[in-house]
Amino acid sequence: MMTTTMDYNSSDQGFSWSEIALLGSVETMLEKVYGKHNHHPPIKVETRRRLSSISEELALETLRKVLNMPNVKTLDGIIIYFLNDAVTVDGSPRLWSGESPVQFPRTPGKKSCRASQAEVSLDREDPSPKFLRGDENGESKHISLLLALGELEFKKAFLLLTYLGGKSLGEVISGDEIRQWKDLPMVAYERAVWFKLGQNEERMQLESDSGKTHYYQCHVAPDGSYRLKGYFLENTGTHLHKVLGDDNVLTVRFDQLPKESTYCDNPYSKYKEIAKNGIMVGLRRYQFFVFKDGGKAEKKKRNSTKQVKCYFIRTGSTASSDMENPYILSGMSIHEARMHFMHVHTLPSPANYMARFSLILSKTKKLEVDMTEITVMQIDDIHCHDQSNNDVLDKNGKPRIHSDGTGYISEDLARMCPLNIFKGKSMRSNNIQGTCVQEPPLLIQIRMFNDGSAVKGIFLLNKNLPPQTVQVRPSMIKVYKDKNLSNFSTFNSLEVVTTSNPPKRAKLSKNLVALLSYGGVPNDFFLDILLNTLEKKKTIFFKVRAAGKAALHYGNMDDKNALQMIMAGIPLDEPYLKHYLSKLLKLEKDDLKAGKLPIDESYYLMGTVDPTGELKEDEVSGLAKSQDVLVYRNPGLHFGDIHILKATYVKSLEQYVGNSKYGVFFPQKGPRSLGDEIAGGDFDGDMYFISRNPKLLEHYKPSEPWVSSSPRSKIYTGRQPSELSPEQLEEELFKIFLKTGFSPSSVIGQAADSWLAIMDRFLTLGDENVKEKAEMKKKMLKLTDIYYDAIDAPKTGTEVNLPLDVKVDLFPHYMERNKTFKSTSILGLIFDTVDFHNAEDTTPSGISKLQCFEDEPVSEFDMEKCKLWHKDYRKEMCQAMNSDDDDSCNEVIQKYKQEFYSAAGFKESKKILEELYPKALALYNVT
């Protein structure tokens, strides 16, 4: 817990109120010191700064020494004396620069599991000649450095610490040098810091950051040391970043532990210390706040902590640049700060607590509305009824519902929503509608935070609602307002995740191909699509449109360099461009090998419930004409997860949505929601595969829908978050993070892989293998239940296991595992066909220069200069390619870009084209 105090010594550095944040335990110990030595005034601002900028253990140890002294001349003097005796210039930079100054000694021949006493303190160091004692004024050199750092704009301070490269601050720079750079423009500042400190680090590319979110990153090593990375710019932001400000949020990645460390009694002790004490960035302290795993799409492929994003937030600072500006969380504990986002303490379990609190991490675009002017109405969910009109209950005894996740929004608010939003990012420019006549989005996937409640789901346009109105259902409300906190302020906002957008041509998936094959779709259907697609992909080498489309799609791989070359008129047979296009073709073929076949007359549309109640149990609406459609939802595994439904036009829908489109409506009739029948789906933003492909509909024969046969969910019986102390809750939440990040359940991936391996063999068996097929089908149904249960387990904290009797260790060859068998199913045929085409395309192409550039005259001076320059480049690049550092090659490229352009790139360069062109021409002819 962080606390602040009033500075009673108003003459101290001119402060009358100082928000010098101390951990709660340190503040408590300080009060005990005041109680014993009560004839002394409270300590000065500078002394509080010193206490706030060190670890909790060291601060408590120092104050205990003071408490145990019989007589004290001055509190400030004795505290400073003890601190100077314990902390060195190199002892603190571990917290300042993000890198441990020393490696603690280990006993030769032994793997030490338990930290020694010297290791426990985050900013202590063994005695050494490097101690710098305090001067006459009681300030040591490192405090002077940190104060200078604290005068910088945070973006500049963070960049400087990033460029330190593991060195301690005092080794490489002085406070006067830092102050000299303080007022430089960012580009000039970066250049000065780079040449002074960072030539061994990856260089920052200072692109235009207007409107972009700054992600400040920190990587923590198993020994507890950490290094800063970034900042990185993205077009998308989170509710957390928008409320606190980008620089008050630190994205933290904890590295995997060495295998030998996992056998220790407490292998994550260093990480727990970080969570408890926080991370110091200069004079700022950041503490653990929230984490989020990669979501359903990432769970199957997760094999490291990279997908588990952990966020620390700023809880205190003694930097002068921060103390001049108010901070929204000043004086709050972590527990209080979370309550201002949502009343998450009301939830039943710590697992549910963190799962729901992570809603603030969704990538969103803020809807610019005054939340106090919006009427939020709660309406009932639409229950599923049997033929006697009684509620139908699920396996847990709760009513089944048709409307899971869907509410309504008034037309005026919908018109304020941007169009074409996907995961918080605008897919097209100039998409803010305002009062334009264009139709508003039909469906808006949202996160709404209002008076302590948290709402997740979609809003369907409803033209019948009064202005400034939204309607939410209980199925959408993930966190309810705590009625005991009626006067407690909250960070209210309506955030847009995704809108219903014009659909692109859909692709199949491995699971869908397997299920369609099981349902009677012949192999020739898939192979015809594959062969036609392979032929079209080859046009990438001789059709500018095809090449440009591919270069744009994969533009993030090369900063759109290939696209710029194509747009500049560079011939497609230019060696580098041709080589790069061949890489893109391989990526496209890899998609095909994985079963991602493009299919005509098929789309992915966001699903919702029919507001009119007119659709029958086997009908959907949203397509222009009445016809049968095939409906599926990824990542469905059950034979009945593919439905054949009748697409029907409902005239009365226009009263609700007008001409808005790009969604699919499911009925609100029947004993069970159609969405739930399709791989346990709902209507909070799920995308459904809709196909009216005539050949698919001709051949596919549907199966009975999925019904869970697993037992009812276990009810959590542990202590609720509200029953835990703040300290206990923080410890419990970080345990959940460690379990999620470092011991992730492999059940999801193993169940899916085992299902596919069994399904592959099932598809190749003839009708004569009745018993074997029946046994295999039984296993697949069991795996399906396990898979669906495991996907939802993190919300409840339920543990799901994979029994050995359904676990597979021999896989079809296209899954590319260690132990494989040769598959002859449709998926094996697809894989082999693409491999055969890859073998045909391996003929190497010669390297030649473009005649137009060879014919132009080049000065001898430029040629000689570029020869030397290129020689140095080749030498450094060879060294980088032979190193173990993945970033080394990119660092060399960035270095030489900087030398060529005198900037991070062409766009940022102030050099005119006439100055760059002769050098570029010489360089082209040298190589």
Swiss-Prot record:
Q: So what does this thing catalyse? A: RNA(n) + a ribonucleoside 5'-triphosphate = RNA(n+1) + diphosphate
GO BP term, pick one = regulatory ncRNA-mediated gene silencing
Q: Where is this region: Disordered?
A: 98-135
Record-linked InterPro entries: RNA-dep_RNA_pol_euk-typ
| Keyword annotations | Nucleotidyltransferase, RNA-binding, RNA-directed RNA polymerase, RNA-mediated gene silencing, Transferase
Per UniProt, the ranges with Basic and acidic residues bias are: 121-135
Query: Which terms does the record give in the GO molecular function aspect?
Result: RNA binding; RNA-directed RNA polymerase activity
EC annotation?
Answer: 2.7.7.48
What enzyme class is recorded for this protein? transferase
Which is an annotated Pfam family here?
RdRP
Its annotated function is as follows: Probably involved in the RNA silencing pathway and required for the generation of small interfering RNAs (siRNAs).
Family membership, please give it.
Belongs to the RdRP family.
What PANTHER family does its record include? RNA-DEPENDENT RNA POLYMERASE, RNA-DEPENDENT RNA POLYMERASE 3-RELATED
**Could you identify this protein by its name?**
Probable RNA-dependent RNA polymerase 4
Organism from which the protein derives: Arabidopsis thaliana (Mouse-ear cress)
From which lineage does this chain's organism come?
Answer: Eukaryota, Viridiplantae, Streptophyta, Embryophyta, Tracheophyta
